[in-house]
């Protein structure tokens, strides 16, 4: 591992390919950045590899592995979606390849482990730092037989420190953003140690980088876990702020850590969140909307992003794009002429322009004219040609007039009367090419606006190419 840093500019024989449509958009800086990223996180060249004369993985192979890891279209070309992922702040541990200077073991042989906070970041108080690490260790001790004890001097199993740039382990940090932290797997010397880049702004909130979230991830590495391909997992390599509410370790991480250490005596949170499977025959959806030519499909803490030119839908945590939004979405719709997407949860709604929440939001749904009895919406769809927006709640539908900014008279109406045959509730809805697509559990109805009737009934998951 010592010498993979020496190879940045010398061990590459193949140029990095890029998408044909992106020729004019990619700068030399983009290409250099992408090569550095791939060398760092996909089969980094190590001293052991050099001594053994191991075959150097080509740039294209690394790029394909990276695209596969993140669920992107595996094109072997450097396109915009690939660069977008590369630019996100992340853990410094490779996704594919060895990250260690000394021999590693798969797990700790003992269940009673010690940790020591060697130094502190100036960004938050000492007590906040200590609380963040205490909570982070508890994430793992809650689901395993592991016990963690803090010591204040001497050498602990897990030594925790903050540093900048080159900080003594041959894996230098890179300044603000980019690489946030790294940790070593169980083993002697550096084994188990976790290092945090003090050029980042560490916080106890959604601002900067939340120390608890990053610490919990890094300690997963300290205990023997590699990165997960599951975008909902704590061990997914990209940083995402998960919200103020009580953190629950996702099921993927529970399965991983218990495969090493077994379960604990009593799990305080037996229901761990799972990542939705797009081809689940029982799949139901929370909300659907278009956004600048793409389709956004919300389910639990996630959304799938469907691009017309891409085969595979991409799955993301909602908070990875909009940290200030709630984890779950009730309804959503796009207003193309205003370049806005509206998101609803409970009695609140947000207006978004791309990644940005508009000033003055969230607002209350009562501002739109809903009575206080309406506590949440189940679906919404906007019609650009008429300026009308339909809102669904319970077994009723409302019609909102954009021009007058009021609800239309004679509403609400019963869903079954307004759209015969689709049932008395709607989970999600969107409009395309003169058809309205209503989703109710695992079934979707294609409804013709012109003939006022259902023309097709399909599985919900067919929207995701299943």
Swiss-Prot record:
Region (Interaction with TIMP2): 171-241
Record-listed Zn(2+) 1 binding positions: 167, 169, 182, 195
Lineage of source species: Eukaryota, Metazoa, Chordata, Craniata, Vertebrata
Hemopexin repeat boundaries on the chain: 276-325, 326-372, 374-422, 423-466
Residue numbers binding Ca(2+) 2: 157, 189, 191, 193
Subcellular location per the Swiss-Prot or TrEMBL entry: Secreted, Extracellular space, Extracellular matrix; Secreted
Binding residues annotated for Ca(2+) 1, in chain numbering: 123, 198, 200
MF term (GO), any: fibronectin binding
Keyword Calcium: yes
Protein name per UniProt: Collagenase 3
Annotated Gene Ontology cellular component terms: extracellular matrix; extracellular region; extracellular space; intercellular canaliculus
PTM: The proenzyme is activated by removal of the propeptide; this cleavage can be effected by other matrix metalloproteinases, such as MMP2, MMP3 and MMP14 and may involve several cleavage steps. Cleavage can also be autocatalytic, after partial maturation by another protease or after treatment with 4-aminophenylmercuric acetate (APMA) (in vitro).
Entry-linked CDD domains: HX (cd00094), ZnMc_MMP (cd04278)
Positions with a binding annotation for Ca(2+) 3: 174-175, 177, 179, 197, 200
EC number, as in UniProt: 3.4.24.-
Function: Plays a role in the degradation of extracellular matrix proteins including fibrillar collagen, fibronectin, TNC and ACAN. Cleaves triple helical collagens, including type I, type II and type III collagen, but has the highest activity with soluble type II collagen. Can also degrade collagen type IV, type XIV and type X. May also function by activating or degrading key regulatory proteins, such as TGFB1 and CCN2. Plays a role in wound healing, tissue remodeling, cartilage degradation, bone development, bone mineralization and ossification.
Binding, Ca(2+) 5: 288, 332, 380, 429
Family: Belongs to the peptidase M10A family.
Biased composition (Basic and acidic residues): 268-279
Main location (coarse class): secreted
Region of interest (Interaction with collagen), ranges: 263-466
Organism expressing this protein natively: Rattus norvegicus
Disulfide bonds: 279-466
Gene: Mmp13
